[in-house]
């Protein structure tokens, strides 16, 4: 889609020069950091030694997933050095990102904004089951919309929309 928007100079939506910021997880983190939104610490997977050095900083478990893409496909939780060595012994031929594992509940912030990036509608969803568990364990996905958006989530969500500089 971005290529078509670029080729035909369509200014709604992202063109090629900005698509990497939402296509690659490692690049997304730069946008979050720009406006002070916290993310899990990460390391682009290179070799076993550097992976173990990163794990020495953040501890076990860690999560590894393709840097490019969405969802939880080909995502793994590595719980110990044996898991890490097995992963590195058979790394798929794509760039992976390794992140510290953060235990918690997934809540989303979704906002629709106008051409000035002012929010015109916002909502939040609560996901009782971790998405990685839903995919890896083939669980049913379910979530519900929250009546109220917590102030800290609303603030982080609004800052994120401004940071990503999306087009209407």
Residue ranges and their predicted role:
Residues 1-46, 50-53:
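Conserved N-proximal alpha/beta basic substrate-recognition cap immediately N-terminal to
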Residues 10-11, 31-37, 65-69, 134-139:
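Acidic/polar active-site rim loop that often engages polyanionic ligands
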Residues 20-27, 72-74, 132-134:
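Short, charged, surface-exposed secondary-structure boundary motifs
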Residues 41, 61-63, 94-99:
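A short linear hydrophobic-aromatic micro-motif
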Residues 52-57, 89:
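Short amphipathic alpha-helix with an adjacent loop that forms part of the alpha/beta core around
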Residues 60-81:
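Conserved anion/nucleotide-ligand pocket segment
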Residues 78-168:
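Internal nucleotide-binding/catalytic subdomain
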């Amino acid at each position: 889609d971005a290529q078509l928007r670029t080729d035909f100079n369509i200014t709604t939506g992202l063109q090629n020069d900005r698509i990497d910021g939402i296509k690659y997880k490692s690049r997304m983190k730069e946008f979050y950091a720009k406006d002070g939104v916290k993310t899990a610490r990460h390391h682009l997977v290179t070799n076993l030694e550097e992976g173990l050095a990163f794990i020495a900083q953040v501890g076990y478990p860690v999560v590894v997933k393709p840097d490019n893409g969405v969802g939880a496909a080909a995502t793994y939780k590595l719980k110990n050095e044996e898991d890490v060595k097995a992963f590195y012994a058979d790394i798929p031929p794509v760039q992976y990102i390794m992140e510290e594992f953060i235990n918690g509940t997934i809540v989303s912030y979704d906002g629709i904004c106008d051409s000035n990036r002012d929010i015109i509608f916002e909502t939040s969803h609560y996901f009782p089951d971790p998405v990685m568990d839903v995919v890896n364990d083939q669980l049913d996905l379910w979530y519900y919309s929250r009546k109220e958006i917590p102030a800290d989530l609303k603030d982080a969500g609004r800052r994120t929309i401004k940071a990503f500089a999306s087009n209407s």
